[in-house]
A protein has these predicted regions:
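An alpha-helix initiation/capping motif
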Residues: 33, 37, 41, 62-69, ...
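Glycine- and acidic
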Residues: 25-29, 176-181, 229, 395-397, ...
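N-terminal Rossmann-like or analogous alpha/beta NTP/dinucleotide-binding catalytic cores
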Residues: 1-100, 189-203, 243
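C-terminal accessory/binding modules appended to enzymatic or scaffolding proteins
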Residues: 361-422
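Catalytic adenosine-cofactor/nucleotide-binding cores of aminoacyl-tRNA synthetases and other
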Residues: 189, 201-358, 419-451
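Active-site cores that bind ATP or allylic diphosphates and position pyrophosphate for catalysis
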Residues: 61, 82-83, 87-210, 215-222, ...
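A generic structural signal for well-ordered alpha-helical surface patches
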Residues: 41, 192, 264, 375, ...
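Residue-level signal for inorganic ion chemistry
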Residues: 12, 43, 75, 79, ...
């Protein structure tokens, strides 16, 4: 599911919650070739991951084809539609004439009876007015006027009797009691055509709100060259759904200078009239900032599960006790993580099995003098009873004073012994993450093999 679709769903969800309405989900699957089971599942998975749950059972549009045809028959009886028997060759010739004359296509069957065409293939077209204008009152764009002379007689039913998108959405929105339609502004022209269908049936036209497109950082239409576009990609890249909701809400809408807000705040503040009409530009740095905020706020147990899944996906099998180790380490290493992938990288060192392999750079830090100093530090650490960050920081500072050196003289080597050269937090954080027995054991493996 494209992030533009995700933002549209989010704005619908926010507006429904804000107004006490219902957030409805309909799968518009009249295009049978594109509407595969996999494509539909992507929509369900994306909405589930984002936490946007529909208030009623999803409706599948194609299953309502009989109802759509019923409405077409009603339009035919009212004189608001007609059967068009033009052959493909005749239609192409009319298109050429229309282009040459600067007008829309008009079928000769618009005001003609079937004559001797009975039995020939036909489509059913809407009989659009040829004069005047159609007004679309839009909550984002304002009043948009369409000259009826520029609106063609759109097809309602294809030659095989299947309904077209523009017909189906009108019928379904009416039957489902939809009062507000919030969607991308690539549908703005459709709003005029759909308004004519509503009017042809004597139905109330819903309130329209057409959202501007999402552009890349350079102002161009968002494309693959700008990076990820699908919700699933952002999930795989380690973004949290609450961060995505917060970020997507800011793409075209905002509340003063507030950058970070809860779902409850967004629901209380959101009004579709406050959406700007200009395209929104993505800013990946802002998304990373938000994701870091939500990672720092998240329940460590939840992060442990998510990070554990990442480790498993990397063929790093978790053993008994690893979850507890991760949960202890995560609060100490998460502050700098912009994504869950970075958080997983930051916890690799706590899952390593002894004896650790040492990188060449890590080995280079362990000269004879440094080894001797770390042995002395190891004995002092063994005597620490309160294995917490504050106590360990104090002990490391005191040790440096006793040695008459700065922490930089032994800190990098200590971190290398504890992590094998893998990324690790500050010294006290690494020690607490590993726990006392594991920390001392790793020191012994390098400094006193066989101890």
């Amino acid at each position: 599911m494209h992030i533009g679709t995700a933002r549209t769903a989010l704005f619908n969800w926010l507006y429904a919650r804000h107004t006490g309405g219902k957030f409805l989900l309909r799968i518009e699957d009249t295009d049978r070739e594109r509407s595969t089971a996999d494509a539909v599942q992507v929509i369900f998975d994306g909405l589930k991951w984002l936490g946007l749950e529909a208030d009623e059972t999803p409706v599948f549009q194609f299953a309502r084809a009989d109802r759509h045809r019923e409405v077409v028959e009603a339009l035919l009886e009212r004189g608001g539609a007609y059967r068009d028997y033009m052959t493909p060759d005749e239609l192409e010739a009319e298109r050429e004439r229309a282009r040459a004359e600067g007008r829309v296509v008009r079928s000769p069957w618009r005001d003609a009876g079937p004559g001797d065409a009975t039995g020939r293939p036909f489509v059913v077209r809407l009989k659009s007015p040829q004069e005047g204008e159609t007004l679309v009152g839009d909550q984002v764009k304002g009043e948009v006027r369409f000259q009826n002379s520029q609106l063609d007689d759109l097809i309602l039913l294809r030659t095989d009797g299947t309904p077209t998108y523009n017909l189906a959405v009108v019928v379904d929105d009416h039957d489902m009691g939809v009062t507000h339609v919030i969607r991308g502004d690539d549908h703005l022209n459709n709003a005029a055509r759909q308004t004519l269908i509503y009017q042809g049936m004597g139905w109330e036209v819903p309130v329209w709100a057409h959202l501007p497109l999402i552009h890349g950082p350079d102002g161009a239409k968002l494309s693959k060259r700008h990076g990820a576009q699908a919700v699933g990609e952002f999930a795989d890249m380690g973004y949290l759904p609450e961060a995505m909701r917060n970020y997507l809400a800011k793409l075209g809408w905002g509340h003063g200078d507030d950058e970070i807000f809860t779902d409850a705040q967004a629901i209380a503040w959101f009004d579709i009239k406050d959406v700007v009409s200009a395209p929104a530009r993505v800013d990946w740095a802002k998304l990373n900032h938000l994701n870091n905020h939500y990672i720092r706020q998240a329940d460590p147990a939840r992060l442990t599960r998510l990070v554990g899944e990442i480790h498993e996906s990397r063929d790093r099998k978790l053993h008994d006790g690893d979850a507890a180790v991760l949960e202890r380490a995560i609060p100490l290493v998460r502050d700098g993580a912009k994504t869950l992938l970075e958080l997983a990288d930051a916890t690799v060192f706590v899952l390593a099995r002894r004896p650790l392999g040492m990188t060449e750079k890590a080995q280079s830090l362990l000269n004879e003098e440094t080894r001797a100093r770390l042995l002395r530090l190891r004995e002092r650490l063994d005597a620490v009873g309160d294995w917490q960050v504050a106590a360990l920081e104090a002990e490391i500072r005191k040790f440096a004073e006793l040695e008459g050196v700065g922490i930089g003289k032994f800190g990098p080597a200590l971190r290398a012994v504890l992590s094998g050269g893998a990324p690790a937090p500050d010294l006290a954080g690494a020690l607490v993450s590993l726990g006392k027995p594991e920390s001392l054991g790793r020191l012994d493996d390098v400094l006193s093999p066989g101890r």
